C-alpha cells in the first residue's frame, strides 16, 4: 500500500480550528474594545452598542462552527475503499478572481463520494485506480434532530476532513 496523503486529526481539522480562533478573537476583541473603555453617556444608544452587537454575532458564528466541528470530530473517522471514476479541475469565480479546486469522484460500488484535494495529492491520483480513503464524514449542526430516516437513501455520501489516502489493489 502506497500512502498518498496522511494527516493527523489536528492537521485534518486545522482549517476549521483557524476559523474558530479567528471568530473568537474578533468577537472577544470587539466586546473588550467596546465595553472596557469608559464611554460618554452623551453617545446615542445605537452608536454605543453597535460594536457589541456585531461582536456577539461573530461569537455566535464561532460557537456554531465549534459545535459543528466537534460533532464531525466525535462522529469518528470512516475508511472506504473506492475506485476513482473522474478527476476534475474546477474553476469558479471567487469575488473578483478565479479559484481552482481539485476534486475526484469515486465509488465503492454502492455510493458515490466526491473528495476535494490539494493539487499535489490530486496529481498523484489515477483514474480507474483503487484507493482507501480515511475521512471524517461531515455532520451538520442539527442533523440528529432534523433529519428523518429516508426510505430512499442518497447515492452521494458527504465527505469531510481527509486524514489518510492509500493506493490499494482493486
Whereabouts are the PLM-identified features?
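Cytosolic-side transmembrane helix boundary signature
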Residues: 25-56
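Internal/C-terminal transmembrane anchor helices
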Residues: 45-73
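Cysteine-centric segments in proteins
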Residues: 42, 69-71, 76, 80, ...
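OB-fold/S1-family single-stranded nucleic acid-binding modules
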Residues: 136-170
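Membrane-embedded alpha-helical segments of integral membrane proteins
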Residues: 1-37
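OB-fold (S1/OB) nucleic-acid-binding surfaces
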Residues: 93-114
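Structural detector for short beta-strands of small beta-barrel domains
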Residues: 74-98
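Short nucleic-acid-contacting surface segments enriched for D/E, G, S/T with interspersed K/R
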Residues: 118-134
Amino acid at each position: 500500500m502506497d500512502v498518498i496523503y496522511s494527516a493527523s486529526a489536528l492537521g485534518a481539522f486545522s482549517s476549521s480550528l483557524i476559523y474558530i480562533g479567528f471568530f473568537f478573537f474578533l468577537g472577544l476583541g470587539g466586546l473588550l474594545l467596546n465595553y472596557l473603555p469608559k464611554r460618554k453617556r452623551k453617545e446615542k444608544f445605537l452608536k454605543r452598542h453597535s460594536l457589541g452587537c456585531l461582536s456577539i454575532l461573530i461569537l455566535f458564528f464561532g460557537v456554531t462552527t465549534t459545535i459543528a466541528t466537534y460533532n464531525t470530530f466525535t462522529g469518528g473517522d470512516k475508511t472506504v475503499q473506492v475506485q476513482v471514476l473522474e478527476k476534475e479541475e474546477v474553476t469558479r469565480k471567487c469575488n473578483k478572481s478565479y479559484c481552482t479546486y481539485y476534486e475526484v469522484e469515486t465509488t465503492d460500488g454502492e455510493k458515490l463520494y466526491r473528495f476535494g484535494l490539494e493539487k499535489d495529492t490530486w496529481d498523484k491520483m489515477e483514474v480507474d485506480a483503487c484507493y482507501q480513503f480515511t475521512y471524517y464524514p461531515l455532520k451538520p449542526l442539527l442533523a440528529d434532530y432534523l433529519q428523518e430516516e429516508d426510505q430512499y437513501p442518497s447515492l452521494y455520501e458527504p465527505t469531510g476532513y481527509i486524514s489518510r489516502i492509500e493506493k490499494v489493489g482493486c
